[in-house]
């Protein structure tokens, strides 16, 4: 047995095996590895993209929530302003009604005073007539005349 020939045969067999593997086995293995690597890279990219999308969605959600809170606060503020305005309008209406009622009552009081004055004038004229009749009917005495006038003044 010749060691050199065996070694040469094994080397040739190995070279054929390597050539066969490089020609037929290696390309599908490399293609599978590249495909797997591409899938992994695509998966990582999709995960990164999803992470960015999630962050964007969270930012948008927080912004929408902030805007909603601001809108709610604005609506509440407007409602409070409107309520205060309505209260002020009601107060003004009550004050105006009070003034109107007070003026009406004052006018009625003035009318009552005028009626009372007219009634008193009528009574004074009646009393003056009665006093004049008593003065003219009685003697023209200075003392009696002053007593009648004092009595009339007391009656008024």
Curated annotation (Swiss-Prot):
Gene Ontology molecular functions: proton-transporting ATP synthase activity, rotational mechanism; proton-transporting ATPase activity, rotational mechanism
Pfam families: ATP-synt_B
Gene3D superfamilies cross-referenced by the UniProt entry: 6.10.250.1580
TM segment ranges: 7-29
UniProt entry keywords in alphabetical sequence: ATP synthesis, Cell inner membrane, Cell membrane, CF(0), Hydrogen ion transport, Ion transport, Membrane, Transmembrane, Transmembrane helix, Transport
Localization, UniProt: Cell inner membrane
Topology in membrane: Single-pass membrane protein
Keyword Cell membrane listed: yes
Primary localisation category: membrane
HAMAP family to which the protein is assigned, alphabetical: ATP_synth_b_bprime
Family, similarity comment: Belongs to the ATPase B chain family.
Primary role: F(1)F(0) ATP synthase produces ATP from ADP in the presence of a proton or sodium gradient. F-type ATPases consist of two structural domains, F(1) containing the extramembraneous catalytic core and F(0) containing the membrane proton channel, linked together by a central stalk and a peripheral stalk. During catalysis, ATP synthesis in the catalytic domain of F(1) is coupled via a rotary mechanism of the central stalk subunits to proton translocation. Component of the F(0) channel, it forms part of the peripheral stalk, linking F(1) to F(0).
Subunit and partners: F-type ATPases have 2 components, F(1) - the catalytic core - and F(0) - the membrane proton channel. F(1) has five subunits: alpha(3), beta(3), gamma(1), delta(1), epsilon(1). F(0) has three main subunits: a(1), b(2) and c(10-14). The alpha and beta chains form an alternating ring which encloses part of the gamma chain. F(1) is attached to F(0) by a central stalk formed by the gamma and epsilon chains, while a peripheral stalk is formed by the delta and b chains.
The protein's name in its UniProt record: ATP synthase subunit b 2
Organism: Marinomonas sp. (strain MWYL1)
Record lineage: Bacteria, Pseudomonadati, Pseudomonadota, Gammaproteobacteria, Oceanospirillales
UniProt gene name: atpF2
């Amino acid at each position: 047995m010749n060691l050199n020939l065996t070694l040469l045969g094994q080397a040739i067999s190995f070279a054929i095996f390597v050539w066969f593997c490089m020609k037929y086995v290696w390309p599908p293995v490399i293609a599978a590895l590249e495909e797997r690597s591409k899938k992994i890279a695509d998966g990582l990219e999709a995960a990164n993209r999803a992470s960015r999308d999630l962050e964007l969605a969270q930012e948008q959600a927080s912004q929408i929530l902030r805007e909603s809170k601001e809108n709610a606060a604005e609506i509440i503020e407007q409602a409070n302003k409107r309520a205060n305005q309505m209260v002020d309008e009601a107060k003004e209406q009550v004050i105006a009604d009070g003034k109107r009622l007070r003026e009406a009552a004052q006018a009625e009081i003035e009318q009552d005073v005028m009626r009372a004055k007219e009634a008193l004038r009528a009574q004074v004229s009646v009393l003056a007539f009665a006093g004049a009749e008593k003065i003219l009917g009685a003697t023209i005495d200075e003392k009696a005349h002053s007593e009648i006038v004092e009595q009339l003044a007391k009656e008024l």
